Regions:
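Alpha-helical membrane insertion/targeting regions
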Residues: 1-137
Length: 137
């Protein structure tokens, strides 16, 4: 497989993660715990696949410079910096949230999930935005 396909695959995985997170949230809001669990495990798995793919790609390609100029440049870097910081933060948050849910510590799970979900969604969506800005503008 050519390395050039990896950024598109990574964006697809990020987008899929965001969709799965929203579906999982919908299910828990409607009391469907079993479906919520299955979908959130799928979101977590998709994120793991993304992370492996992302690391593999950048281990072989390195960093990709942003070629945009003008006002788009500071916008891009603002999004990229916030995305990068929160991408580091979300890893332990998602793991702890997952462990608490799987170990039936639902009060602690719920409390942390209220913080984890918006951060995870932001990271997933801005991952797609960064991809679009870097490769398609």
């Amino acid at each position: 497989m050519a390395l050039t396909i990896f950024p598109s695959i990574n964006a697809l995985l990020n987008g899929l993660t965001a969709i799965l997170l929203l579906i999982g949230y919908y299910f828990i809001l409607h009391g469907k715990r079993v479906l919520h669990k299955k979908i959130m495990l799928s979101a977590f798995t998709t994120s793991i696949v993304f992370l492996c793919s992302y690391l593999y790609y950048h281990a072989h390609v390195g960093s990709v410079p942003f070629k945009g100029t003008g006002i788009i440049r500071p916008i891009y870097f603002t999004i990229l910096i916030s995305h990068t910081i929160l991408a580091v933060v979300i890893v332990p948050m998602a793991i702890v949230t997952l462990v608490r849910g799987l170990s039936s510590r639902f009060d602690k799970h719920r409390k942390l999930a209220r913080l984890t979900l918006p951060v995870w969604l932001y990271v997933s969506v801005t991952g797609v935005v960064v991809y679009m800005m870097l490769y398609h503008f």
